[in-house]
Structures are given as structure tokens and as C-alpha cells.
């Protein structure tokens, strides 16, 4: 899209050495480099119907960025509608964005998830495909290079595949449809909801839908997801 700046999820939001989210300082530098200030409005979009765009959205919110928005419909939809395209690489004056300390209320870690299995006021939402959830496959066909060695799901998790939330063109279903879908599976706003997937990107998509479209007050993304859970000896697994 003309004027868009590349923000590479592998380079700019993941610490490849630790396989963890980047530090506050690294995010500050990355966003300053592309001209971002604290009062900038960020609009994110990407491929795979915005998997990684919502992952970036979650990271930005984790470090306190105020005005982040998701384009409804991914890059593919933009192409298909014959909208303006560019090969130019824009340059911007370095920005002055300053990140906040991490907002730990939107992130879940493995030990916390393990402790909360079976809790009546919390619910785990596995947003992977049904075959991943049941242990028939270890990773999605779209992104199969990182996965847990063991198949299955976290005990007690309900399966709501991320693609049940979107139409074929990548646009999101209505809030009415989404509310009906989640409440039919007992994923209700009175509970703390923890989302997870394979490596964190699809979990961020569902986190975005629940928190920002449906207004659930307490939603966390377990970004370690199955890559961490399914590679850790002794973790409980169901199929």
C-alpha cells in the first residue's frame, strides 16, 4: 500500500535468540526508525488474513501504544479490489516514540496457564485448526516451520479456530455473529479468557476480536502457545 512501512514480525517483534517478544528498548528503536511518535496512529495489515498484523497489534498494546488499528481485510483483499499499489520504499524522519512498561494484564505465561487449568472463572481458547487441536497435525499448512513435538491441546481448552471469525476475503464477521459463536461455547465476558495457538500470532487475532470487537474485559494471549507447551517435558496434554 503506498506509504506503508515494512515491519517484519521475525525481525522487529520477535527476539530470535530467545524466541520471545522483543524488549521495550528494541521496540522503541524499531518504531522510531520508521518515524513513529507517541501520537501517531498506526494501521496494521499483513498476509494470512492478518495473522501477523494482529500479533504486531498485540505487541504494540503490550508496550502501551495508544492508537493502533487493524485494517479490516488483509493485503490480499486490497490486491483483489485493484486498489493503489507501490514499489517505492518510503523514508520518514526518525520518530520519538517512548514505550511504556509491559502491560502484563494482556499476557499469560506457561506456569500461570498450568496453574489455572480447571479454574471455573477462567477459560482457555485454542484457536488452531481442529486437526491441530486433536493432535492429528502439529502445525498449520500455511506456516509449518515452528511447532510443538507433541500433538494435542491443553486440558480443558475449547477449540474455536481463528478462521471461524472471518469471511473468505479476510474481513471480520459481525459482532453479533461473533458474540453468538463464543457464548455458545461458554466463552463469556464474565470469565478471564486465555487464547493460544501454535506460535502466538493466531492467538493474538482472537485476543483482538474478544477484547476490541466484543469488549471482553479480561483477555490474555498465551504467546508461548503450543510451540512452548508441546515442547516442554511433563506438561499435561489432551487429545
What are these regions (language model features)?
Residues 42, 122, 193-195:
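Generic beta-sheet signal
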Residues 10-13, 48-51, 75-77, 129-133, ...:
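Solvent-exposed loop/turn segments at secondary-structure junctions
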Residues 4, 60, 78, 157, ...:
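Terminal peptide-recognition signature
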Residues 1-38, 114-190, 238-239:
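Positively charged, proline/Ser/Thr-rich regional signature most characteristic
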Residues 45, 125-127, 196:
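Short hydrophobic segments within beta-strands
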Residues 21-119, 136-137, 152, 202, ...:
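Thiolate-centered catalytic microenvironments shared by cysteine-dependent enzyme domains
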Residues 14-17, 78-81, 169, 229-232:
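Short, charged, surface-exposed secondary-structure boundary motifs
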Residues 180, 190-226, 230-239:
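C-terminal soluble interaction/assembly domains
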